[in-house]
Each structure stands twice: as structure tokens, then as C-alpha cells.
């Protein structure tokens, strides 16, 4: 999250992509109309192909856009809350970072019941989430005023552990496909760090994975091969990095301020990007499916 505003809900105009063979890879197109909603952030796809995002007309609201193009308010977080990053576990439960209330919520996909997983007053504002295969959560926690940040681990019992402090503005976060590495970026400092994940989920051996000379970062996600897709806030692109930090390609996303992304679609090869300037979703097709999508397939 770089900036937020909450505008009027726009009219959704959507074309669902079903096959890579009929489409050009790496070419973004509008997935919703401009002005769909202000404050758009935190996209995630469920196993049925619906796209979820926060800020649907109100900071408490989470939107669901179904494969047939219908947009609805899926659920509202409690009073005083504001959602940001969304993730799903392998059983289909949704987790949402609540950056104003210093909480992380779990939402039942059937009953839509909102359950508090953790409330940690020491958090600045939990921003984005990553989830390991065993359900361990990791949360970035920036302090935008001071350009600093923290990093948290939430174990499967719901206990929060501060894994790192005195970092830069921690933002995008992701676990590698083999579960051995955690990536976290610093938006203002333009660095991506990587940690080793130990057997208990704790982190060690922090080192620089990649640095850029310009523009900021926001959300990021891995594909099944461990390539890291990173939003370049201010540049209007998503950059694809290999597991060795090589720049493989950069995709224009039709607006200057991409805030986050996720993989979905029928084959896991559609990337959905929340673009904050035009307040809309855009999408593009890729050659390999996303990590979370592959977990859905394995869990069926």
C-alpha cells in the first residue's frame, strides 16, 4: 500500500480469460472499468476463479468479482477496520491484514464469518501477507511516517512473533515454492530482501536479493517456478525476476501505480493487478501458473 482513496464504485466491465492459446502473453488489458473503486488493493483469487480485493467503496469492504463478471460486496470488516493484503490458505479460508486495527482476520468462505486471528498492538499497520504451505502467515508492517518497518510471523496457533525490526518500509511479501525462502521488499528504499525459513517457521540469514535505482515497490507474488513478480509503483509496471534475481521481463500495466497482484483464472496463468491511479483491475496472461493456484490444484 502506497496511498489510498475511497471513491464511488464504478461499473464493472469484464472479460474473463480462459485460454492462453488465443491470447497474447505479457500484454495487459483492462479487467474492470476505470473508477471501479478507490483504494483498490490486496487482490487474491479463490479456487473457483473469483477475484477479491479491498476498498470496495469503503475501507472495510471486500469485493468479490465472479468468473461471469458480477461484482458484489463479499463481506465488511468490523467497525474501525481497513483491509489491505488478502491471502487464502489451502482449505479456502481467507486472511486479511487490517492495517488500522493492528489485526489479522480470517473469513469463512461459506458463512462469511469474520474471526480475529491476532491482535498485536506492537504492529505499525499490518500491510501485506504471505502464507506458507502449512498455514504459517508472514506479515509486512511498515511505518510510512518514519520510513521504517517490521516483519511478523503468525504461527498456526495464532501467536505473533516479530521476526525483524528496524527495516525500511516493508511491503510486498512472498514465500518461495519450496518453502525455504521468504521475500520482503522495502518500498521507499527500493530493496528486496530474502530470508531463510527454518523448520519452525522463524527466519534467519537476511540478505539483499535485488535493488533498483528508481521507483518504488508494492505487492509481489511467485509463480510455480519461483519467479517473482513485483509491482513497480510509480513506474506502472510489473517486473518478473528469476530465483537468481535476473530481470526476465517487465510488463506495462496501463497505469502508473500498481499496488498489488495475484494469479488466477482457469489455468492459473492470468495475473490480476490492482492499479490505484485509475482505480481499477487490469490483467495479463503469463506462461506459467502462480504458486497459490498450484496449491489449490494440489488440495482438490
Residue ranges and their predicted role:
Residues 22-37, 206:
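A short helix->beta-strand "capping" segment at the edge of beta-propeller domains
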Residues 30, 72-76, 115-119, 162-165, ...:
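Beta-propeller fold detector
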Residues 34-51, 78-94, 98, 103, ...:
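Beta-rich, blade/repeat-based domains predominating
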Residues 53-72:
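Beta-propeller domains
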Residues 59, 101, 147-148, 189, ...:
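A detector of repeated loop/turn-to-beta-strand junctions in beta-rich toroidal repeat architectures
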Residues 61-63, 103-105, 150-152, 191-193, ...:
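A short loop-to-beta-strand structural motif that recurs across blades of beta-propeller domains
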Residues 65-70, 108-112, 154-158, 197-200, ...:
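Short loop/turn segments that connect beta-strands within beta-propeller blades
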Residues 260-300:
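Blade-level signature of beta-propeller repeat domains, shared across WD40, Kelch, NHL, RCC1
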Amino acid at each position: 500500500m502506497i496511498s489510498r482513496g475511497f471513491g464511488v464504485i464504478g461499473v464493472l466491465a469484464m472479460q474473463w480469460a480462459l485460454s492462453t492459446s488465443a491470447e497474447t502473453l505479457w500484454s495487459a488489458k483492462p479487467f474492470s472499468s476505470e473508477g471501479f473503486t478507490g483504494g483498490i488493493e490486496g487482490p487474491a483469487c479463490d479456487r473457483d476463479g473469483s477475484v477479491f480485493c479491498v476498498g470496495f467503496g469503503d475501507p472495510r469492504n471486500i469485493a468479490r468479482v465472479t468468473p461471469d463478471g458480477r461484482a458484489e460486496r463479499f463481506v465488511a470488516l468490523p467497525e474501525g477496520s481497513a483491509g489491505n493484503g488478502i491471502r487464502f490458505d489451502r482449505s479456502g479460508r481467507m486472511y486479511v491484514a487490517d492495517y488500522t486495527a493492528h489485526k489479522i482476520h480470517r473469513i469463512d468462505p461459506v458463512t462469511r464469518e469474520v474471526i480475529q486471528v491476532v491482535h498485536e498492538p506492537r504492529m505499525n499497520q499490518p500491510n501485506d501477507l504471505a502464507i506458507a504451505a502449512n498455514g504459517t502467515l508472514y506479515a509486512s508492517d511498515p511505518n510510512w511516517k518514519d520510513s521504517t518497518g517490521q516483519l511478523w510471523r503468525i504461527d498456526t496457533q495464532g501467536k505473533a512473533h516479530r521476526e525483524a525490526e528496524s527495516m525500511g518500509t516493508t511491503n510486498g511479501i512472498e514465500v518461495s515454492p519450496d518453502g525455504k525462502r521468504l521475500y520482503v521488499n522495502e518500498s521507499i528504499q527500493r530493496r528486496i530482501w530474502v530470508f531463510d525459513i527454518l523448520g519452525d517457521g522463524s527466519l534467519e540469514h537476511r540478505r539483499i536479493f535485488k535493488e533498483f535505482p528508481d521507483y518504488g515497490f508494492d505487492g509481489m507474488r511467485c509463480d510455480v517456478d519461483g519467479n517473482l513478480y513485483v509491482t513497480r509503483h510509480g513506474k506502472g509496471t510489473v517486473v518478473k525476476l528469476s530465483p537468481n534475481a535476473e530481470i526476465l521481463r517487465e510488463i506495462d500495466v496501463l497505469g502508473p501505480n500498481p499496488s498489488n497482484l495475484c494469479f488466477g483464472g482457469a489455468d492459473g496463468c492470468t495475473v490480476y493487478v490492482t492499479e490505484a491511479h485509475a482505480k481499477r483491475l487490469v490483467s495479463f496472461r503469463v506462461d506459467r501458473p502462480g504458486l497459490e493456484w498450484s496449491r489449490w490444484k494440489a488440495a482438490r
